[in-house]
């Protein structure tokens, strides 16, 4: 039996650690390429804005907002401002924000990682910035492929990310608990946070 088939059979039992010991799902489905097999966000890794590989297991026990960002979008100002505010108010409660620059929508994130980091510093960003990625298509980062197929990560009219600043709320176990469209400002997430802290 292939590892992929085994993981698909066991996934209902392992999903988000429902019946598994912590880390077991990651042991079973450790291949970064077999993203469908993952049971939580914590099984992935991504390069930060400085190019260092980050194991997302570091977010175990934290509530996370994962979003794609762009510097030249009409929604940039409101999203960066509100994300910075949410992080400032709730970081001590266990909120973490993971921002992934993406140039797939109107080519509104054309800069280098260094330029994006400098832009974000203008908003006094203290949350975690990652290297530029794709969120749709064959070249999409495995984390984003995985989030889009989760029961509470699916979109309206298909699972593809529609635009900049699509946001996913992730619980302490690394499970997607809600997806917010690009027109929903970060402040709407605030009402959902207390349920997961």
Swiss-Prot record:
Record's keyword annotation contains Ribonucleoprotein: no
Matching Pfam families: GSHPx
Annotated catalytic residues: 73
GO biological process: arachidonate metabolic process; lipoxygenase pathway; negative regulation of ferroptosis; response to oxidative stress; spermatogenesis
EC number: 1.11.1.12
Catalysed reaction equations from the record: a hydroperoxy polyunsaturated fatty acid + 2 glutathione = a hydroxy polyunsaturated fatty acid + glutathione disulfide + H2O; (12S)-hydroperoxy-(5Z,8Z,10E,14Z)-eicosatetraenoate + 2 glutathione = (12S)-hydroxy-(5Z,8Z,10E,14Z)-eicosatetraenoate + glutathione disulfide + H2O; (13S)-hydroperoxy-(9Z,11E)-octadecadienoate + 2 glutathione = (13S)-hydroxy-(9Z,11E)-octadecadienoate + glutathione disulfide + H2O
Keywords, ordered alphabetically: Cytoplasm, Developmental protein, Lipid metabolism, Mitochondrion, Oxidoreductase, Peroxidase, Phosphoprotein, Selenocysteine, Transit peptide
Coiled coil: none
Cellular component terms per the entry's GO annotation: cytosol; mitochondrion; nucleus
Phosphoserine sites (modified residues): 40
UniProt function note: Essential antioxidant peroxidase that directly reduces phospholipid hydroperoxide even if they are incorporated in membranes and lipoproteins. Can also reduce fatty acid hydroperoxide, cholesterol hydroperoxide and thymine hydroperoxide. Plays a key role in protecting cells from oxidative damage by preventing membrane lipid peroxidation. Required to prevent cells from ferroptosis, a non-apoptotic cell death resulting from an iron-dependent accumulation of lipid reactive oxygen species.
Family, as annotated: Belongs to the glutathione peroxidase family.
Record's subunit section: Monomer. Has a tendency to form higher mass oligomers. Interacts with FUNDC1; this interaction promotes GPX4 recruitment into mitochondria through TOM/TIM complex where it is degraded by mitophagy.
Name by which UniProt lists this protein: Phospholipid hydroperoxide glutathione peroxidase
UniProt source species: Sapajus apella (Brown-capped capuchin)
Organismal lineage: Eukaryota, Metazoa, Chordata, Craniata, Vertebrata
């Amino acid at each position: 039996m292939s590892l992929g088939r085994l993981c698909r059979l066991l996934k209902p039992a392992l999903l988000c650690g429902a019946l598994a010991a912590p880390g077991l799902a990651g042991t079973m489905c450790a291949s970064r390429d077999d993203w469908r097999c993952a049971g939580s966000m914590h099984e992935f890794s991504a390069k930060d804005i400085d190019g260092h590989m980050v194991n997302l297991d570091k977010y175990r026990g934290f509530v996370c907002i994962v979003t794609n960002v762009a510097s030249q979008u009409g929604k940039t100002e409101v999203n960066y401002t509100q994300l910075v505010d949410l992080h400032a108010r709730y970081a001590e409660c266990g909120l973490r924000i993971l921002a992934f620059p993406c140039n797939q929508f109107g080519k509104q994130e054309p800069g280098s990682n260094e330029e994006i980091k400098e832009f974000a510093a203008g908003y006094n960003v203290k949350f975690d910035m990652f290297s530029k990625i794709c969120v749709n298509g064959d070249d999409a980062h495995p984390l984003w492929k995985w989030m889009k197929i989760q029961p509470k990560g699916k979109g309206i009219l298909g699972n593809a990310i529609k635009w900049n600043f699509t946001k996913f709320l992730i619980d302490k176990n690394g499970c997607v608990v809600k997806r917010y469209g690009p027109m929903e400002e970060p402040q709407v997430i605030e009402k959902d946070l207390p349920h997961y802290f």
